[in-house]
């Protein structure tokens, strides 16, 4: 029998895909809980009514109402907005549009969001890491030393999973370092919790700046899978060349347009205020809990904390149906768990469970 006839289907796959470790999303990790505080979702659902019923027709590639509503909300021109299946698709589009596999590299600064790495590896693009400094700010010298051959640099601000904003002066320095050399992608998935820190006002000054946004967090629409890329028109036109013909279904576009109406944006801001209030309650309670070593500052809808025995705490709460996010495998996050801010009842269950832990 010839070798060709004995190859498995897996052997036919690209080598980098066979070796790929997929992103471990909260849903993929599973669990049988009733308090889900591991995916940075809003804890309660928002109701919408569909107004578009023409499901026999293909949708617009870039639904006009969604684009115009988001442009108005973000303070940019409609030509500077692209809508996609979550911000994750935006990550992939930028890499596909700007990076030559086997030639170019992306750069990111762990501990940070895992999809930058996974998307690049899937496409066959080199990944370079410049670990963040001890305070989780950018190592600008390390980044500068790694820019040769780097085509895209990803920065998450506020950073997931650490929760802090990146120093704006460091971001400006990074944009100057990369001018004419690389695209800088600022991931602003959590910017609604600290809107004063957005970089949208910098888009005119830095044509190589790309900003990622989402409806999954403050807009409470993680199940919708709707994200946005903000950039200058030239970048958007390049991304439109590689995006799928119909990225948003008609129901998704319908709900997204409603969420981005003046009424929808006001409701989002009310949710943010509620989340910030609950975050402070949770921080105060964690700081008075014996098994908690340190609670890190957060500008988001989640809190990172270091525990005296994080593995046993994580498992104990898991067994009680309280699902948190273990960060022990992330660089510099040994002993850390990430806790999404939930409802008052959910937050109290977390605190009660933690205070029952042996010290």
UniProtKB/Swiss-Prot annotation:
Q: What is catalysed by this protein? A: L-histidinol phosphate + 2-oxoglutarate = 3-(imidazol-4-yl)-2-oxopropyl phosphate + L-glutamate
Q: Which Gene3D superfamilies match?
A: Aspartate Aminotransferase, domain 1, Type I PLP-dependent aspartate aminotransferase-like (Major domain)
Instruction: Please name the pathway.
Output: Amino-acid biosynthesis; L-histidine biosynthesis; L-histidine from 5-phospho-alpha-D-ribose 1-diphosphate: step 7/9
Cofactor(s) demanded: pyridoxal 5'-phosphate
Instruction: Identify residues that carry N6-(pyridoxal phosphate)lysine.
Output: 217
Query: What are the record keywords, sorted?
Result: Amino-acid biosynthesis, Aminotransferase, Histidine biosynthesis, Pyridoxal phosphate, Transferase
The domain of life for this entry's organism is Bacteria
User: Which GO terms fall under biological process for this protein?
Assistant: L-histidine biosynthetic process
EC number(s) recorded for this UniProt protein: 2.6.1.9
Q: Which Pfam families match?
A: Aminotran_1_2
Q: Name one GO molecular function term.
A: histidinol-phosphate transaminase activity
Name the protein family. Belongs to the class-II pyridoxal-phosphate-dependent aminotransferase family. Histidinol-phosphate aminotransferase subfamily.
The record's HAMAP family line, in alphabetical order, gives: HisC_aminotrans_2
Q: How does it assemble?
A: Homodimer.
| Name of the protein | Histidinol-phosphate aminotransferase
Q: Which organism is it from?
A: Salmonella paratyphi A (strain AKU_12601)
């Amino acid at each position: 029998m010839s070798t060709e006839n004995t190859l498995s289907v897996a052997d036919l796959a690209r080598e980098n895909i066979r070796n790929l470790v997929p992103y471990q999303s909260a849903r993929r990790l599973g669990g049988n809980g009733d308090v889900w505080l591991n995916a940075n979702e809003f804890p309660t659902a928002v109701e919408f009514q569909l107004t578009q019923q023409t499901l026999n027709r293909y949708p617009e590639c870039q639904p006009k109402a969604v684009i115009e509503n988001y442009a108005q909300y973000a303070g940019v021109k409609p030509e500077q907005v692209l809508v996609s299946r979550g911000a994750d698709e935006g990550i992939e589009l930028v890499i596909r549009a700007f990076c030559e596999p086997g030639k170019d590299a992306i750069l990111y600064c762990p501990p940070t969001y895992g999809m930058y790495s996974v998307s690049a590896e899937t496409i066959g693009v080199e990944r370079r890491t410049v670990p963040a400094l001890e305070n989780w700010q950018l190592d600008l010298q390390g980044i500068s030393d790694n820019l040769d051959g780097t085509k895209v640099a990803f920065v998450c601000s506020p950073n997931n999973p650490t929760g802090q904003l990146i120093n704006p002066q460091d971001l400006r320095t990074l944009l100057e370092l990369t001018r004419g050399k690389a695209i800088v992608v600022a991931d602003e998935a959590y910017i609604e919790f600290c809107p004063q820190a957005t970089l949208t006002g910098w888009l005119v000054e830095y044509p190589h700046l790309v900003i990622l946004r989402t409806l999954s967090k403050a807009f409470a629409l993680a199940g919708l899978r709707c994200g946005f890329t903000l950039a200058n028109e030239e970048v958007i036109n390049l991304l439109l060349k590689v995006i799928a013909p119909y990225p948003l279904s008609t129901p998704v576009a319908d709900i997204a347009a409603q969420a981005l109406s003046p009424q929808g944006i006001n409701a989002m801001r009310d949710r943010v205020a509620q989340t910030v209030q609950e975050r402070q309650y949770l921080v105060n309670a964690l700081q008075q809990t014996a098994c908690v070593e340190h609670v890190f500052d957060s500008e988001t809808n989640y809190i990172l904390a270091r525990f005296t025995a994080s593995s046993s705490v994580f498992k104990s709460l898991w067994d009680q149906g309280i699902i948190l996010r273990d960060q022990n495998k992330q660089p510099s996050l040994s002993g850390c768990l990430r806790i999404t801010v939930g409802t008052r009842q959910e937050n109290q269950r977390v605190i009660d469970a933690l205070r029952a832990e042996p010290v």
